[in-house]
Amino acid sequence: MEQYKYDFIEFALSRNVLKFGEFTLKSGRISPYFFNAGLFNTGRDLAKLGEYYATAIQASQIEYDVLFGPAYKGIPIATTVAVALANQFAIDKPCCFNRKEAKTHGEGGQLIGAVLEGKILLVDDVITAGTAIRESMQLIKLNQASLAGVMIALNRQEKGNGELSAIQEVERDYACQVHSIINFDDLVYFIEQSAKHAPYLTKMREYRAKYGV
């Protein structure tokens, strides 16, 4: 596992963004871990989060023209990623995000920031049902742009209602790749190397056996 992935897991644990234990998800599943990126909520944490996204984007070698953050969680992510790319890698990419409802006065429209054109890299925290991606695709197509790829913080690597995960469905439906800073397998590997978190290993493996893709 790359060092930045290990460091990101440590960072998420230190901010209680990532927790191991027993958690009931909206789906009703009992999960041995919980991830809430909304708890990256200070200037320092958001700056660091952007750096991890930027590192993962560079590692993925995605070719893109514009960063797009779907409302609402994707907005601060796209912003901090754009800053991190400029500061860390001297890559100055335009950044765009959407409103949930189109504005009829002022600058108007549904988009804020750069023009949504060319190859779009969508950034978000996680993909649960893929709803934000599908809504974003309507905007991307409306602007004659194309989806170059998606970068999220965590790929849960678990089935939805069918045999595929929401991420696999997005990849199938839009012929794009979904990348992540870390995935479920990385969490398992991290626990395998950590005596402190060893008690959670069995539950994590059981969860993967039951719901993994």
Swiss-Prot record:
Pfam families cross-referenced by the UniProt entry: Pribosyltran
What PROSITE patterns would the database entry show? PUR_PYR_PR_TRANSFER
Give an example GO cellular component term for this record.
cytoplasm
Binding-site residues for orotate, renumbered to this chain: 34-35, 128, 156
Q: Which GO terms describe its biological process?
A: 'de novo' pyrimidine nucleobase biosynthetic process; 'de novo' UMP biosynthetic process; pyrimidine ribonucleoside biosynthetic process
Give a short account of what the protein does. Answer: Catalyzes the transfer of a ribosyl phosphate group from 5-phosphoribose 1-diphosphate to orotate, leading to the formation of orotidine monophosphate (OMP).
Question: Could you tell me what this protein is called?
Answer: Orotate phosphoribosyltransferase
